[in-house]
Amino acid sequence: MEFLWAPLLGLCCSLAAADRHTVFWNSSEPKFWNEDYTVHVRLNDYLDIICPHYEDDSVAEAAMERYTLYLVEREQYQLCQPQSKDQVRWQCNQPNARHGPEKLSEKFQRFTPFTLGKEFKEGHSYYYISKPIHHQEDQCLKLKVTVSGKITHSPQAHANPQEKRLPADDPEVQVLHSIGHSAAPRLSPLAWAVLLLPFLLLQTS
């Protein structure tokens, strides 16, 4: 039974190590007033988008903020213009929901079991923009998410920086390996007979 606890313990540790980053997606959020609103995450972290929500009737329903969020490329992020409907990630479309504000979550994982899931890589940035549903004004809210890479350690002091690595030591280099027998030249039976013939004649004389 103790072997069954090992993977469960590892899963719990990985979940405990993951952080959640909350973004309130509405025009009143001061962080959106800057052009470079950026969130830094690590693999297996979560991004929680909190949609606009109104608890009373002080705002007319037609004026309640609703957004379509897109996951786009850097150029489209800069222009705040999605390229296609295939880039739609979520919709914030229930501003007066009784259960409270909608929460939309993204997990930054390297691999996903879902066909339509998104896979993320360390050292890369990803871009979210939105277009308003509640009015036709070109109001753009955008967010940049950077997946931080692993911490790299500096080389040891005694290591020789001029020392060259052999191709076989570099996993990225394709090394040709011989297959079958050794590539060294082999003598045929006739050649062996010619070489041994003088010794045989000396033994019989």
UniProtKB/Swiss-Prot annotation:
Extract the Gene3D superfamilies matched here. Cupredoxins - blue copper proteins
Q: Which residues form the propeptide?
A: 183-205
What the protein does? Cell surface GPI-bound ligand for Eph receptors, a family of receptor tyrosine kinases which are crucial for migration, repulsion and adhesion during neuronal, vascular and epithelial development. Binds promiscuously Eph receptors residing on adjacent cells, leading to contact-dependent bidirectional signaling into neighboring cells. Plays an important role in angiogenesis and tumor neovascularization. The recruitment of VAV2, VAV3 and PI3-kinase p85 subunit by phosphorylated EPHA2 is critical for EFNA1-induced RAC1 GTPase activation and vascular endothelial cell migration and assembly.
Lineage of the organism: Eukaryota, Metazoa, Chordata, Craniata, Vertebrata
Modification(s) after translation: Undergoes proteolysis by a metalloprotease to give rise to a soluble monomeric form.
Q: What is the protein name stated in its UniProt record?
A: Ephrin-A1
Which of this chain's residues carry glycans?
A: 26
Q: Name one GO molecular function term.
A: ephrin receptor binding
